[in-house]
Amino acid sequence: MNAMSRISRRIFLALALSLAGLAQAQLSIEITGAGANRIPVTIVDFPGDPTAARVVTATVRADLERSGLFKLVDNGTAAFDENAPVNHAEWKGKGADALAAGSIARSTDGRMEARFRLYDTQKGVSLGGAAYVTNNSQLRAAGHRIADFIYEKLTGEKGVFSTRIAYVVKARGQFLLQIADSDGQNAATALSSTEPIISPVWSPDGGRLAYVSFEKKKPVIYVHTLASGQRHIVANFKGSNSAPAWSPDGRKLAVVLSKDGNSQIYSVNADGSGLQRITQSSGIDTEPRYSADGGTIYFTSDRGGSPQVYQVGASGGDAKRVTFEGSYNVSPRPAPDGKSLAFISRREGRFQLAVMDLASRQVQVVSDSNKDESPSFAPNSRMILIATEIGGRGVLSAVSSDGRIKQRLSVAAGDVREPAWGPYYQ
């Protein structure tokens, strides 16, 4: 933190995601692990506008494949729309448990409609379908929504392909706060600075980011409205202002302030008013996160002698220790479904992602890297995004909560860190 505060350069603000001239550090994705029992599915080629159809079907296939839960069955040269009769036995014989067919129709005003239908070839029934109005710039978004539909119908869980992620890229002396689709594509810069940017976190509605910027030569917490590019200061007290975390209703932020001495946890309204102290300890309390129901705040504290995860009521009160295995457990992140808690645990000198089942209190290390930090759950609680280091360079890794599915996201030049997975598509 002291090293970061010594950096003294000028900041450049990108007040809208569409601002031209800023380099976009596109993420590339590598699948390094898949689920044990993948669902075989075929996505047939969509007839209609050929260019648009290729974009949509390629996006759907890529989404399903990188999820680690699906095995793509070759469709050969098959191309038919959502209304064509389906020979379920034929596709079942080819090894496909499910099949999706659709079409892309272009209207005179330039807009397009992506239609599709999903079939269960084992039962010989339709699982429903949908139609999405789109245009040339939103074809991949339509593909993500189709993939979400397929994912939910075949797994029973909501898909997260239409969600977005935020992260910070450090390249050529610049810190770029960027937002991208969940697959790393369509990256756009929200803020560019020669000063560090850390701890981005999404508001529950996906419309705002809170983060810490060092542009004032000290850590200050901002809330940034993405649609307009406007932002305001939430916490700029004496000392350090850090680690913002949204309440589930989006009205408050838990923050860490050192204005009264040691770093302690406070809550503050999203407009910066209504400051209230939450923790009272002689140690350092930091990294707060609200539980899914908003009633509890999980945080890191060294009050017991070593960094461990604790929990306290959202309005304060007595804190209870949560982690007991090992001498170093930090960065707690409760799952959106309220069933588990992700955190970083040091095991034999390795900093790894661990997941605790909150009912049984059983802990499982789910990553195989050595320098993990900053975990962030997907909104369906299935995947966890972390920052880690490979070959001396910062990359992002997405790991399933059971450790079986792994993806790696990196940029061609530069370090990428501080990931935050956004909420469901609004």
Curated annotation (Swiss-Prot):
Keywords: Cell cycle, Cell division, Periplasm, Signal
Source organism superkingdom: Bacteria
Gene Ontology process terms (BP): cell division; protein import
InterPro entries membership: 6-blade_b-propeller_TolB-like, PD40, Tol-Pal_TolB, TolB_N
Gene Ontology CC annotation, any one: periplasmic space
Places the protein is found: Periplasm
Any Pfam family matching the protein: TolB_N
Signal peptide positions (record): 1-25
Quaternary structure annotation from Swiss-Prot or TrEMBL: The Tol-Pal system is composed of five core proteins: the inner membrane proteins TolA, TolQ and TolR, the periplasmic protein TolB and the outer membrane protein Pal. They form a network linking the inner and outer membranes and the peptidoglycan layer.
Family as reported in the entry's similarity comment: Belongs to the TolB family.
UniProt xrefs under PANTHER family: PROTEIN TOLB, PROTEIN TOLB HOMOLOG
Record-linked NCBIfam families: propeller_TolB (TIGR02800)
Function: Part of the Tol-Pal system, which plays a role in outer membrane invagination during cell division and is important for maintaining outer membrane integrity.
Protein name: Tol-Pal system protein TolB
